From Swiss-Prot:
GO terms for biological process: 'de novo' IMP biosynthetic process. It catalyses: N(1)-(5-phospho-beta-D-ribosyl)glycinamide + formate + ATP = N(2)-formyl-N(1)-(5-phospho-beta-D-ribosyl)glycinamide + ADP + phosphate + H(+). Mg(2+) binds at E274, E286. It comes from Variovorax paradoxus (strain S110). GO terms for cellular component: cytosol. This is Formate-dependent phosphoribosylglycinamide formyltransferase. Disulfide bonds: none annotated. NCBIfam families: PRK09288.1, purT.
Length: 400
């Protein structure tokens, strides 16, 4: 039986989130509803999750000594990475020394912090289908990889980046230099490394939210949410919907791939597994060992949304991945470059049938920064997508 304490008392169950953006904020709220004391960590002050947590801490999470000092000072029960830009070797060191338990595991955090670790695990160790790929350290290596068999069109991504930053499509030789420069500008490490992938002419792409949680006997079991369809622009999520229809054979393959990858990563929690689908064929793309941006739709569609599932799973509590209603989400962009912006049209957005919105509270807006999301439940996903985009379009961010 799992025992939970009382926040701000000696009995408290204390959870530290490394990364406190909009996804982390919802995880923190889910944890607090279960009586957990929360510590929100980010690289800048007043991050969305810091606005709702019991404690807010601001450090450079990629600095191993800062990270170690904070964990040793706060003594959390669990450390939950919510972003990739973390000193994961230090997390591994602290977990190995018995200082803290990392969710899902320190190894999973390390392997998924960059595209190389997880791609080599999936394709070379586990043998799951992926697009053809090469890793390159220079423009010359990139061109050689394309010429040697990757071919055109292809996709180039920094090995370390988030939210589609630095990702582009190469249609021919004239695009190679531009794609390399864009990847270098968008990566989290200067003079970085890229992955170039052969283009898969897929029918659609999905996120399969996969949950590793304990059953009544205490054994970890794998459960799946209904597939989530989504549209990405330059690798960044724009809208998502659930459920996305899939042929039974394709769904079975998707679940087999997701279970193989997440079982190897181990631990407990929710994973966002991204997959390409063409007919009955399925290819693994990426995995995040945490709630996924496309999964925000579950706040409108599931009895327990992805954040509640993650919170329950990491605490050893029962989970329910079942669907409540079809639904969709659509991103609300900042529209302006400013701090402390205002939002007009909120009432108009909420007049859309079945709608809800989340405004993330990010202190600084950029024209294409995700500042909120519209959520809609409806009788079918087509209706939900139309209404979600309508609701999102009614919110008008502006300089205050």
């Amino acid at each position: 039986m799992t025992t939970l304490g009382t926040p701000l008392s000696p009995s408290a169950t204390r959870v530290m989130l490394l990364g406190s953006g909009e996804l982390g904020k919802e995880v923190l709220i889910a944890l607090q509803r279960l009586g957990v004391e929360t510590i929100a960590v980010d690289r800048y002050e007043n991050a969305p999750g810091q606005q709702v947590a019991h404690h807010a801490r601001t450090i450079t999470m990629s600095d191993p000594e800062q990270l170690k000092a904070l964990i040793e000072a706060e003594k959390p029960t669990l450390v939950v990475p919510e972003i990739e830009a973390i000193a994961t070797p230090m997390l591994q060191q602290l977990e190995d020394a018995g200082v803290v338990r990392v969710i899902p595991t320190a190894r999973a955090a390390r392997l998924t912090m960059d595209r190389e670790g997880i791609r080599r695990l999936a394709a070379e160790t586990l043998g799951v289908p992926t697009s053809p790929y090469k890793f390159c350290d220079s423009l010359a290596e990139l061109q050689a990889a394309i010429d040697a068999g990757i071919g055109y069109p292809c996709i180039v991504k920094p090995v370390m980046s988030s939210s589609g930053k630095g990702q582009s499509k190469i249609d021919g030789p004239a695009d190679v230099q531009k794609a390399w420069d864009y990847a270098m500008a968008g990566g989290r490490v200067s003079h970085g490394r890229v992955i170039v992938e052969g283009f898969i002419d897929f029918d659609y792409e999905i996120t399969l939210l996969t949950v590793r949680a304990k059953d009544a006997a205490g054994a970890v079991q794998t459960r799946f949410c209904e597939p989530i369809g989504h549209v990405q622009v330059s690798g960044d999520y724009v809208e998502s919907w659930q459920p996305h229809p899939m042929a039974p054979a394709a769904l079975q393959k998707a679940q087999q791939i997701a279970e193989a990858v997440t079982s190897d990563l181990g631990g407990q929690g929710l994973f966002g597994v991204e997959l390409f689908v063409k007919g009955d064929e399925v290819w693994f793309s990426e995995v995040s060992p945490r709630p996924h941006d496309t999964g925000m739709v579950t706040m409108a569609t599931q009895w327990q949304n992805e954040f509640e599932l993650h919170a329950r799973a990491i605490l050893g509590l029962p989970v329910d991945t079942s669907l409540k209603s079809p639904g969709a989400s659509a991103v609300i962009y900042g529209g302006v470059d400013a701090t402390g912006i205002a939002f007009d049209g909120v009432a108009e957005a909420l007049r859309v049938p079945g709608s809800d919105i989340r405004l993330f509270g990010k202190p600084e807006s950029f024209a294409k920064r995700r500042m909120g999301v519209a959520l809609v439940h409806a009788a079918d996903t087509g209706t939900a997508r139309r209404l979600a985009k309508d609701a999102a379009s009614r919110v008008k961010p502006r300089k205050a």
